[in-house]
Amino acid sequence: MSRRRGKVEPRHIEGDPKYNDKVISKFINCLMVDGKKSVAEAVFYDALEVIAKKTGQDPYQVFQEALENAKPQVEVKSRRVGGVTLPQFQSKFVRERRLALGIRWLIRYSRDRNEKSMKNKLAAEFMEAQKGTGSAIKKKEDIRKMADANKAFSHYRW
């Protein structure tokens, strides 16, 4: 039995110091390790500078396009019904969850790259995601294919 009576209010997040953007602030918070926010900010802004030097494009625009391309369109979940686990199927999606997954995937696959420093890893992943390639985009496509393959179970309403 639930003890809470009302809705949970989402936390208020301030925009980042440079662009005053809440999405960048969320990205920096997810990038942060051991509470070292200043280090995470430095890595993020250095990555944007690397993008500006390599491409000559607006790094803020590159980041936004990369994040938009990395956001999944569908989510797949397994469901247990009557002792049987049904395969992963497509489910409804909330905008905040799409953003969170896109951020999480960009950071995870940036850390897995072979470049020397984190700023270079992050910049490379942003540039690849903007072009529609890269590991984060591959993850998004894999999930979409899984949802398409298991569309037979999408008629269930839980």
Swiss-Prot record:
Entry keywords, A to Z: Ribonucleoprotein, Ribosomal protein, RNA-binding, rRNA-binding, tRNA-binding
GO cellular component: small ribosomal subunit
One Gene Ontology term of the molecular function aspect: rRNA binding
Gene3D superfamilies on file: Ribosomal protein S7 domain (1.10.455.10)
Superkingdom of the organism of origin: Bacteria
Transmembrane segments: none
Any Gene Ontology biological process: translation
Family listed: Belongs to the universal ribosomal protein uS7 family.
Function summary: One of the primary rRNA binding proteins, it binds directly to 16S rRNA where it nucleates assembly of the head domain of the 30S subunit. Is located at the subunit interface close to the decoding center, probably blocks exit of the E-site tRNA.
Subunit text: Part of the 30S ribosomal subunit. Contacts proteins S9 and S11.
Protein name: Small ribosomal subunit protein uS7
High-level lineage: Bacteria, Pseudomonadati, Spirochaetota, Spirochaetia, Leptospirales
Gene for this chain: rpsG
